[in-house]
UniProtKB/Swiss-Prot annotation:
Record organism: Parasynechococcus marenigrum (strain WH8102)
Protein name (database record): Glycine--tRNA ligase alpha subunit
Keywords: Aminoacyl-tRNA synthetase, ATP-binding, Cytoplasm, Ligase, Nucleotide-binding, Protein biosynthesis
Subcellular location: Cytoplasm
Catalytic activity: tRNA(Gly) + glycine + ATP = glycyl-tRNA(Gly) + AMP + diphosphate
Superkingdom of the organism of origin: Bacteria
Top EC class for this record: ligase
A GO CC term attached to the entry: cytosol
InterPro entries named in the record: aa-tRNA-synth_II/BPL/LPL, Gly-tRNA-synth_heterodimer, Gly-tRNA_ligase_asu
Biological process according to GO: glycyl-tRNA aminoacylation
Length: 296
């Protein structure tokens, strides 16, 4: 199954389960969780069901394209359902079957692994899903986002698309994965991977990155004060990515790392609080019986 067909198969499957199909969010982020379609929508009482592919960036994971299984840019497929439905593990196994992976023919294990994002002030309980000895999915019941208790609890399912694809295509290197019948993964992404790694590890200017972090932090704080949580989140995500770039350059001390994560977490908490207040002021319109505000 080609890489693009894995995405479309998961999209069809989760659409049939009642999920909205959305597109990737248009700023750098380290995980699909950081999209507002997850990190904001997991907060508050309104129901939500969404599925979307998400490109992710983790600068320190780059290896100039020389490692067959590690890259600073990769893809996840993200599912968030609130409240968490009954039988979600069985539904997930059915999604694997849709990809041609039948539970009866494979060793599929749910291994306890609680999840935490220090920068988002988010955590949950759940499992890693191992397929014949390889982790392919993270299952998380969100307990908090932005330091706010999640009521009701959401279920987040995050598929590692490259890992699934290497298994389904039986290849050793992600760069050899077929994207479709004509092009492979490396044809598309390897030039960007090499160039981005040079930037991440050698080409970026640490002092300029620190200046950018301060600008993004100030912008996020100002937007929160103006009660604009959605654009404020964009700048929190920019802070997070800029911090990751500074880590890749090796210019963040242990003390600075802890303090900087704390600054981002504080912003994330303030965004979450502002988002919840905004939705509450609207009367939580996605609740049954709620009404959407009329257009101005």
């Amino acid at each position: 199954m080609h890489f693009q067909d894995i995405i479309s198969t998961l999209q069809r499957f989760w659409a049939d389960q009642g999920c909205l199909l959305l597109q990737p969010y248009d700023t750098e982020k380290g995980a699909g969780t950081m999209s507002p379609h997850t990190v904001l929508r997991a907060i508050g009482p309104e129901p939500w069901a969404v599925a979307y592919p998400e490109p992710c960036r983790r600068p320190t994971d780059g290896r100039y394209g020389d490692n067959p299984n590690r890259a600073q840019h990769y893809f996840q497929f993200q599912v968030l359902i609130k409240p968490s439905p009954d039988g979600i593990q069985e539904t997930y196994l059915a999604s694997l079957a849709a990809l041609g992976i039948k539970a009866a023919d494979h060793d599929i294990r749910f291994v306890e692994d609680n999840w935490e994002s220090p920068t988002l002030g988010a955590w949950g309980v759940g499992w890693e899903v191992w397929l014949d000895g390889m982790e392919v999915t993270q299952f998380t019941y969100f307990q908090q986002c932005g330091g706010i208790d999640c009521k009701p609890v959401s279920i987040e399912i995050t598929y590692g698309l490259e890992r699934l694809a290497t298994y389904l295509q039986d290849v050793e290197s992600i760069w050899d994965l077929s994207w479709n019948a004509e092009r492979n993964y490396g044809d598309i992404w390897l030039p960007f991977e090499k160039g981005q790694c040079h930037f991440n590890f050698e080409g970026s200017d640490p002092e300029r990155l620190k200046q950018l972090f301060a600008i993004y932090e100030a912008e996020a704080s100002d937007l929160i004060e103006k009660k604009l949580p959605a654009p404020a989140l964009d700048f929190v995500l920019k802070c997070s990515h800029t911090f990751n770039l500074l880590e890749a350059r090796g210019v963040i001390s242990v003390t600075e790392r802890t303090a900087t994560i704390g600054r981002i977490r504080t912003l994330a908490r303030r965004v979450a609080e502002a988002w919840l207040a905004e939705r509450e002021a609207l009367g939580f319109p996605l609740l049954e019986g709620g009404t959407l505000p009329s257009a101005a």
